[in-house]
Amino acid sequence: VSADEPLDAVLTALRSIFGTTDRLPGVAPGLFVPDPARWAPAAALAGDLLPVLLARAQRRWQAPPHVAASLGWKAYTYWLALPAMLGYATARRVPLLTGDAVLVHFDDPRPLVTLGLRPDVPVAVLPGDPFAGRPGVAVVAGEDELLAALRRSLLDQHLLPLLGALHGAVRIGRRVLLGSLASGMAYGLLRAGEPVGPVLTAMGLDGLIDVVPPGAVRRRTCCLAFTLPDPKICTDCCLPTRSCG
């Protein structure tokens, strides 16, 4: 993706935060997938690939099925949501990350799953954006409509089907999973200097995290990492403050 592409701002933000776009754990080098031959649509994670995802998660964390599912969801949704959060925060350009616009594979044994974006992933922008009118770029009326497009694509058309599939396969609560999503989205927004509240409210995820000075995230739910054979307390965990709910 060259400097005259709508999501160049996302790549710039990733380089600013991580120093690279080519060596992010579980993300395709450069974020985009030029050759989809060995990849599958991410929508398959809620179907045929769900057993693969769950088995990989259990082997990775040596955890009961519901704990492995929680941690797998947390890892996947952080890296999935990050391009959308950075695009919105830095340029008010939202890649529409539906289950068909995102590709995944399990060939690399190091991450749980590797994800990448199709080069022609649709992007929603505001009126007056320099990329308005280009093929694959949808112009929406204002900020509310931009956030609505984010919710439809990322949540309704991608993550809620996966959440439903996970919930049907293992005993894991919806609130636990949505708390991890809210936390991951908040981290992405804060990294880019963007207020968290409006985005989480638009996504229906408000009330799941708090932002505490100096700009840290405190969850109101627990990802269950403390139940691992080698227990872990995450930096944003609600357990130390007994604020889980």
Model region roles, listed by residue range:
Residues 126, 244-245:
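Short, surface-exposed linear patches
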Residues 1-71:
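Generic N-terminal leader/targeting and pre-domain segments
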Residues 220-244:
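Local cysteine-cluster metal-coordination motifs and their immediate loop/turn environment
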Residues 2-8, 93-96, 237:
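Contiguous N-terminal and early-domain "leader" segments and peripheral loops that mark the onset or edge
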Residues 42-215:
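Hydrophobic, aromatic-lined core segments that form the binding pocket/scaffold
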